[in-house]
From Swiss-Prot:
Family the entry assigns: Belongs to the Mediator complex subunit 21 family.
Keywords: Activator, Coiled coil, Nucleus, Transcription, Transcription regulation
Record keyword Nucleus present: yes
Organism per entry: Emericella nidulans (strain FGSC A4 / ATCC 38163 / CBS 112.46 / NRRL 194 / M139)
Quaternary structure note: Component of the Mediator complex.
A single cellular component GO annotation: mediator complex
SUPFAM superfamilies referenced in this protein's UniProt entry, alphabetically: Mediator hinge subcomplex-like
Subcellular location: Nucleus
Domain of life of the source: Eukaryota
Keyword 4Fe-4S among record annotations: no
Protein name in UniProt: Mediator of RNA polymerase II transcription subunit 21
Positions of region (Disordered): 70-118
Amino acid sequence: MADILTQLQTCLDQLATQFYATIGYLTTYHDNSPAIPPDNPTSAPALAKIQKNSTNPPIPAGAAAILNASQGSPSGAATGAVTPGPPAPNASAGSGAGEAGAARQEEGLPPRPDSPRTFTARQRELARDLVIKEQQIEYLISVLPGIGSSEAEQERRIRKLEEELRAVEEEREKRVRELRVLRRRVEEVLGAVEGGIYGGSSY
């Protein structure tokens, strides 16, 4: 039973690790494509337009407009919903500086998303691994002692095991007493042999 419990704990730890790895992959390598709009357009608030692979969380369009107005736009032309994000690179800079800035900006971005076919294939593979691990856990639980037995049957089994344990303990104590008797006899024989060898000899 202890071995089954150890395997069950190991499988649970592995399942938690697989959950974490799956969520990490889906979050990192998703292409962030817009979802199909629902039939009811008012079921969720509209979100402000964000740049692809932006690390900033999406915010409602109304909140973005209020934020833009609170920043004190002098011309009032910036009425579109804009999500706060990193400043755009300077367009007046030279080509070399622009490439360097783009490279620096590329370093801070997350990895490129997988293609839809690759993403779907890996998503299915991760889901299959989760199902297999869950089936292993169900099997280990099914072979645990007491599964499918009533409370009375488990109590009878416990009492029977207690009786067997007491019988084994009594047998062990009996063997220990016999061992002590045999040890005393061996010590007496060794003492007699030692006395016979060294006691009667004279020089």
